[in-house]
């Protein structure tokens, strides 16, 4: 039985930094300043009280919400741009106004709430989708309007068991997933009693700009010619016409939101082992779980959407530039801006579906491992020119992100431990068109991966049939955890 509840919320307050902070204007990187990132990302995190962490125990606050509020105000002293506001400035480049951050210390939104439910009521194990998730988040208004608004909105919901839920909206132009996690980790550090965040924040957005990385390189990706076409089609009428044509040809763009459905697919060790068994030995041993599941999801999605065999389909893989692969352009520890680059794989739909799974896995691996400094520079240059990625002329694009490692060993309050969470089906729906790979534990306590998938309702039924064939499962219901509309 799915639990239902209503949270009792306090009035929202604007929480300012605990001490005076610099008043200045900060520039964003070219990756930060994408029009496609002008929205609020939504994240929820569930926490349980540690043993001995009941109210009144040494080190455990009687009121977690007030402790987190004080820690957030202190964290904003270090992350003071987050307490500011975005402003548009004219840009002569023809791609529209740029954003800058005015560090005004106006503050972020904070809400305290209570709910008459326990942590275990959200499910055992704790897996998405989360019931009544809207009750765990404060109202962000229009999540596509970011100029002149608070950049962070946080709600702390206290549960009957002593646990609590952090629910927040944060403007994606300010931080990516790792940056968001770093900010929340700083709050946890300070709530635990540390004198300063374990990792001090670094702004340095100039490191990911075309001016810094520019090499004049041409992006050798399937998007190169289309990116050039997007740049040359400066007429709004031409751009709007191209978008309408793409939407008409792609059910992902033409289906109304009320006819879409999100489902979450759980892959434990047994499912992953079965899929590896369909690969040659050399590939089965070296392929990561992310690469394997990405290939599987892309194939099933392509089949479910019924693309013609000659149509080109694309896979866009979000990669973290803080990773070991990026030894050529290292980012300093503490960098919390957008540092994701997104190489693209492309294939004809008929070829993708007609060839063995191993070929798709190989394509995914080549795409990931082909992200050189030259390609990274070319992508940043393209983003600087178009202010978006992928170019709006692209269609039939499936984006995947691996966020399994953003919460590992993070969020240690001392008196509370992270129990689960991630990106829920709430807030801006257009940001949920891709798939997120999240780490969790299944009912047997085994480390597993949950992958989200948003599709038109009719296509979802076909998707589950394709997945059942790959996993050799008769019961398609056993493939998913639960669906969300």
UniProtKB/Swiss-Prot annotation:
The keyword Transmembrane does not apply. Its EC number is 2.3.1.-. Keywords: Acyltransferase, Plant defense, Transferase. One of its GO terms (molecular function) is acyltransferase activity, transferring groups other than amino-acyl groups. The active site is at residue 172. Disulfide bonds: none annotated. InterPro entries: CAT-like_dom_sf (IPR023213), Plant_acyltransferase (IPR050898). Highly expressed in young panicles. Expressed in leaf sheaths and panicles. Signal peptide: none annotated. One of its GO terms (biological process) is defense response. The gain-of-function mutants Spl18 (T-DNA tagging) show a lesion mimic phenotype, express constitutively PBZ1, accumulate the phytoalexins momilactone A and sakuranetin, and display enhanced resistance to rice blast fungus (M.oryzae). Plants over-expressing SPL18 show a lesion mimic phenotype and display enhanced resistance to bacterial blight (X.oryzae pv. oryzae). Belongs to the plant acyltransferase family. Involved in defense against pathogens. May contribute to disease resistance by potentiating disease resistance signaling, or producing phytoalexin-like secondary products. PANTHER family: ACYL TRANSFERASE 4 (PTHR31147), OS10G0105900 PROTEIN (PTHR31147:SF54). This is Acyl transferase 1.
